[in-house]
Amino acid sequence: MPKKAGILLALTVLAMVVLGYHPGLEDDAYYLAAIKQRLNPALFPHDSDFFRLQFQATLFDRLIAGSVRLTHIRLEWAAFLWQFAAVFAILAACWRISRQWAGVALVAVLLSIPVSGTGISLVDQHLHPRALATACVLWAVAMTLERRFVFAGVLLAGAASVHAIMAAFGISCCLFLAFPEGVQGVAMLLPLGWVFDPASEAWRRAAATRSFYFPLRWEWYEWLGVLAPVAILWMFGRFGRRLAWFAIFQFVVAIAMMLPPGLERLRPLEPMRYLQLVYLLMFLLLGGLVGKSVWRWVVVFIPLCVGMTYAQVQMYPSSPHIEWPGTVPSNSWVKAFVWVRGNTPVDSYFALDPEYMAVPGEDFHGFRALAERSALADNLKDPGMVARVPRLADRWLAESEAQRGWKGFQAADFLRLKRAFGVDWVVVNNAAVTGLECPYRDGDLRVCRVE
């Protein structure tokens, strides 16, 4: 047991080194903000609906905030340790399923690989409820294979408490593994009365920003990533064929949900994300196959480690590959956000370029999560929340339209935002902006009052 734990610990360290760690990145703009508001309810007095409403159906933010209160560990370290624990639990579950270290090692180095047609990776570079749910689901798969169904049910309930959609995929997968003959023709039953409510034009504009909602727009290689796993899994005996049937069933369900225009409200359920579980189990099986030859394994494994690490470094070139908790940030945008957190009132209301996350050098760090201040809606991440919470659509559209032409804004435009929404601060990346008092400057990047 100590030897196995030591190997799992080493593989977890390897996985974290390859994956990297970036708090506040991408979806963590929501999750970290929600946890921080749970710890300090005074935060985000103007815009908490853009993350709070989704968290009504999950215990994730309560769980992480509760662990901080219980242990008195700083949140940045608590989030890092939860991420490490989630990766460890995923790899431990993979070992329990396959009993082959080669397969577990392959999964460890491929955690950052994109999943076709879904907009996600196997594991994110920050703490995400999907990672915790994935660990629970994989352990439920292991318990199902061992016919320990009560434990599997408890684990799936745990997954549902933090990420209901991942839990649904886990339930489906476990049913196919336990009772393949009895579920291949079973349809999914959901309370879908809300699906047929008419969608607003504002909601459609927000949903249109999510390319993975529209399968007919996918590239050929994305379709290859959807269909090839079925053929690969079919080669791995009874276990592989049961997983293939699971993949086929979920694919049919996903297409039935995503293609008909009348079911457009179902698209935010992201039914193609069942592929995350399929990819994990497929790589686990492939790793075991490659590992039967030591030399073949070395030839595959070492280049994969180097290549996957290099890809992650290049994906966020202006940030350290691992943004360690408690360290001084080197990314100029993150430094500005940290300054905002320490030097502006808690009830401040900010405006930024609505596409600031995609600005070169920003590296997709979320303002709310890192600055801990309210901000007008953006055009990159907030539309995804609008798609899930349609009542936000009109507000998002109004704020988005008000910020149209941001790159040419001057003091008069910012005063217009102040009159319309109450904005009293802006973050600008344009040295040509004049007429504002800007107490923070770092090159062209400035934090300015709107008075």
What are these regions (language model features)?
Residues 1-14:
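Start-transfer (signal-anchor) and selected internal transmembrane alpha helices
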Residues 4, 186, 291-316:
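Signature aromatic-anchored transmembrane alpha helix within multi-pass, membrane-resident enzymes
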Residues 13-91, 97, 101-110, 114-135, ...:
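Active-site lumenal/periplasmic loops and adjacent helix-entry segments of GT-C-fold
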Residues 16-32, 39-57, 164-170, 176-279:
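Transmembrane catalytic cores of multi-pass membrane glycosyltransferases
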Residues 70, 144, 158-166, 371:
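Transmembrane helix irregularities
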Residues 81-89, 127-136, 167, 171, ...:
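Membrane-embedded alpha-helical segments of multi-pass membrane proteins
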Residues 132-151, 178:
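Membrane-interface transmembrane helices that cradle and orient dolichyl/undecaprenyl
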Residues 314-451:
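Extracytoplasmic
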